[in-house]
């Protein structure tokens, strides 16, 4: 088992302080989600997207993953948060253990594919010639996929 948990990448935290990421819906950067098999090994130290151990293209899933639709950041009390619309890869045969969300627009790390978060699905998730859907948690201060308290 290579995935060991969900992480907000340390490089992402630094890049936030450098104004490298823009999550605004209409004028923000392009964020993607790439799916990986259980051989992938990601931690909070992951800095860039990689094709190594990414699942094979199938149906509407292609190399590099799918483009996410940003939800403009907001706050509640002392927590700022943002989210993405759910994404579905149709007619896909996929077995994925986890994912990377990364920014295709920045140049803050070692390239233009700076990672934001590592997602561990907890076990392999599969679809066979069907829909592979990623449902993001509720966009609030306690549950949003990206939160800063």
Regions of interest found by a model, annotated:
Residues 1-97, 104-149:
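Small cysteine-rich, disulfide-bonded extracellular modules of the LU/uPAR three-finger superfamily
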């Amino acid at each position: 088992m290579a995935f060991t948990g969900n992480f907000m990448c340390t490089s992402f935290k630094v890049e936030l302080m450098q104004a490298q990421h823009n999550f605004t819906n209409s004028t923000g950067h392009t964020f993607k989600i790439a799916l990986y098999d259980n051989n992938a090994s990601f931690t909070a130290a992951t800095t860039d997207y990689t094709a190594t151990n990414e699942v094979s293209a199938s149906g509407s899933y292609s190399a590099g993953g799918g483009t996410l639709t940003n939800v403009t950041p907001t706050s509640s009390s002392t927590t700022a948060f943002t989210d993405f619309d759910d994404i579905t890869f149709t007619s896909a045969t996929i077995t994925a253990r986890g994912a990377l969300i990364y920014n295709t627009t920045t140049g803050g790390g070692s390239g233009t594919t700076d990672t934001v978060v590592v997602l561990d699905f907890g076990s392999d998730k599969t679809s066979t010639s069907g829909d592979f859907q990623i449902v993001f948690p509720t966009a609030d201060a306690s549950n949003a996929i990206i939160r800063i308290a």
